[in-house]
């Protein structure tokens, strides 16, 4: 009898531990839940996630789907992603074709909880979208004057979903937008110290058009469209595309035409194309790779510090002065 009772107690102890773990770490069918059973807000990437965190504070749980150095252009869902999407109260996507793989589209399109920030911004005329060969450029986080508008969209969605915390979300959002405005002005000041004849950006792939239009071009160039001559890359909007000899030669000609002395590799991209370009120019033109890589489709520590990194690196490598940032 004692042995039987001991067995029963042992089984009950295991059941208790299992249930406790489920409460603490589980994801129920009705949504992500943590120890406090807070609804979860899922962001597709860190550029969105870092803004969402600032807006919600500690009122809601937050999570990010595409982490680390993974390429958002080519991301295919892995085990557990389906549950994360199904269990989230709101899913913030960049939109504009960034989340275009079949597995992501299957679970995001027609999902009532999915919010495409880029499309919402275009619908209310918040910015002028850029295109390449008829494809919309999704890299809007590169321009803080656009991305702070995304914060406003995020806030409006969250207030509609959770009106009980509207005052707190609005206050957090206003503080963040103010900080982003200061950071935007700082970036313009830094990059304006680069001599105008040196403001030419050669990067790994075409992720810096919004950045160039906002921070490297003159007002006259923005108005006329001539700002496009301020940047080039061997790869297109997505790093998935194959690079041709013609693409490489176009960059070589650009470097010679504008007397470019430094080209910028990107953290997540293979540097072979840029190395070939530098190598092919060795005898006729002195050009080198920047000492550090730029971040385009991912972040280093967080979105805001990564933006500062890119601004400082481009400014200093192109002959400008990186001013002290107050934020």
UniProtKB/Swiss-Prot annotation:
Residues 1-20 form the signal peptide. The keyword Iron applies. It is found in: Periplasm. GO terms for molecular function: metal ion binding. Gene3D superfamilies: Nitrogenase molybdenum iron protein domain. Pfam families: ZnuA (PF01297). It comes from the Bacteria. Keywords: Iron, Metal-binding, Periplasm, Signal, Transport. InterPro entries: AdhesinB (IPR006129), Bact_metal-bind_prot9 (IPR050492), Lipoprotein_PsaA-like (IPR006128), ZnuA-like (IPR006127). One of its GO terms (cellular component) is periplasmic space. The keyword Nucleotide-binding does not apply. Fe(2+) binds at residues 73, 139, 205, 297. Monomer. Part of the ATP-binding cassette (ABC) transport system YtgABCD involved in metal import. Binds Fe(2+), Mn(2+) and Ni(2+), with a preference for Fe(2+) and delivers them to the membrane permease for translocation into the cytoplasm. Belongs to the bacterial solute-binding protein 9 family. This is Metal-binding protein YtgA. It comes from Chlamydia pneumoniae.
């Amino acid at each position: 009898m004692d042995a039987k009772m001991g067995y029963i107690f042992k089984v009950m102890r295991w059941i208790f531990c299992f249930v406790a773990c489920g409460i603490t770490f589980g994801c129920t069918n009705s949504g992500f839940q943590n120890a406090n059973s807070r609804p979860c807000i899922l962001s597709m990437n860190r550029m969105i996630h870092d803004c969402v965190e600032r807006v919600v504070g500690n009122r809601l749980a937050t999570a990010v789907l595409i982490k680390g150095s993974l390429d958002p252009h080519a991301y295919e869902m892995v085990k557990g992603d389906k549950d994360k999407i199904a269990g989230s109260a709101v899913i913030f996507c960049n939109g504009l074709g960034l989340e275009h793989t079949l597995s992501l589209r299957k679970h995001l399109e027609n999902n009532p909880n999915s919010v495409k920030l880029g499309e919402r911004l275009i619908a209310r005329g918040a910015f002028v979208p850029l295109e390449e060969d008829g494809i919309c450029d999704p890299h809007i986080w590169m321009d803080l004057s656009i991305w702070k508008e995304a914060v406003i969209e995020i806030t409006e969605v969250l207030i509609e979903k959770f009106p009980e915390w509207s005052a707190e979300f609005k206050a957090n959002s206003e503080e963040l937008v103010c900080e982003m405005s200061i950071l935007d002005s700082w970036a313009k000041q830094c990059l304006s110290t680069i001599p105008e004849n040196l403001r030419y950006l050669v990067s790994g792939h075409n992720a810096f058009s919004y950045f160039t239009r906002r921070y490297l071009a003159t007002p006259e160039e923005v108005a006329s469209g001539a700002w496009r001559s301020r940047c080039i890359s061997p790869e297109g909007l997505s790093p998935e595309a194959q690079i041709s000899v013609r693409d490489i030669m176009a960059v070589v000609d650009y470097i010679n035409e504008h007397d470019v002395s430094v080209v910028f590799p990107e953290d997540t991209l293979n540097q072979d194309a840029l190395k070939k370009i530098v190598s092919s120019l060795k005898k006729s033109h002195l050009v080198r790779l920047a000492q550090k890589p730029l971040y385009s489709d991912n972040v280093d520590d967080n979105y805001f510090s990564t933006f500062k990194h890119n601004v400082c690196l481009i400014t200093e490598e192109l002959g400008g002065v990186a001013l002290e940032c107050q934020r």
